[in-house]
């Protein structure tokens, strides 16, 4: 049943070759999000391992992590914490820089978004290099969170981001893998 469910979810992802540049296959989850059944299945699958447990906050990475993370937080009766690009949050923040293919970027979180000891799940749509997710985990831990897991709809395993998180002691849960990027 679970394998069939994830196969149907994988079929709901649109693959766009040569976007945003030649040689890249963009995995577009907007088709999954626009289909009520697929969206429900994805959220239910992300929630299932944590239902009935104590999850204080779900942290979502801008922007698609907001959509998925908000739905997961709702189902778990948890709070939701947005992790945004630097300069987008109005209150006092803590931030961290991380490496991109060419250069660096920075993400931030409100300093009062997490209480020490909060049990947190990190959610985003896709993990590739793991740079943003690693930075997010570091921010959450800096504020005293216990990062229970990092959850993604899609993993691009050959790029190694999920393993990078595992090497930091983070449990990684993904719903599907795509080869090629």
UniProtKB/Swiss-Prot annotation:
Its EC number is 2.4.2.7. GO terms for molecular function: adenine binding; adenine phosphoribosyltransferase activity; AMP binding. It is an enzyme of class 2 (transferase). It comes from the Bacteria. Its main location: cytoplasm. Pathway: Purine metabolism; AMP biosynthesis via salvage pathway; AMP from adenine: step 1/1. GO terms for cellular component: cytoplasm. Coiled coil: none annotated. Homodimer. Catalyzes a salvage reaction resulting in the formation of AMP, that is energically less costly than de novo synthesis. PANTHER family: ADENINE PHOSPHORIBOSYLTRANSFERASE (PTHR32315:SF3). HAMAP family: Aden_phosphoribosyltr. This is Adenine phosphoribosyltransferase. It comes from Methylorubrum populi (strain ATCC BAA-705 / NCIMB 13946 / BJ001). The lineage of its organism: Bacteria, Pseudomonadati, Pseudomonadota, Alphaproteobacteria, Hyphomicrobiales. The gene is apt.
């Amino acid at each position: 049943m679970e394998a069939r469910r994830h196969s149907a979810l994988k079929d709901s992802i649109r693959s766009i070759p040569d976007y945003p540049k030649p040689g890249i296959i963009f995995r577009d989850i907007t088709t999954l999000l626009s289909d009520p059944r697929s969206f429900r299945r994805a959220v239910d699958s992300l929630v299932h391992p944590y239902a009935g447990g104590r999850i204080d906050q779900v942290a979502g990475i801008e922007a698609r992590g907001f959509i998925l993370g908000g739905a997961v937080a709702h189902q778990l009766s948890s709070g939701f914490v947005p992790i945004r690009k630097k300069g987008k949050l109005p209150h006092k923040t803590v931030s961290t820089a991380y490496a991109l293919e060419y250069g660096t970027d920075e993400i931030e979180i409100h300093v009062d978004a997490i209480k020490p000891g909060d049990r947190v799940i990190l959610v985003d749509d896709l993990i590739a290099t793991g740079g943003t997710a690693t930075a997010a985990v570091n921010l959450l831990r800096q504020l005293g969170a216990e990062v229970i897991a990092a959850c993604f709809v899609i993993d691009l395993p050959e790029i190694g981001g999920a393993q990078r998180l595992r090497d930091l002691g983070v449990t990684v849960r993904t719903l599907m893998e795509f080869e090629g990027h």
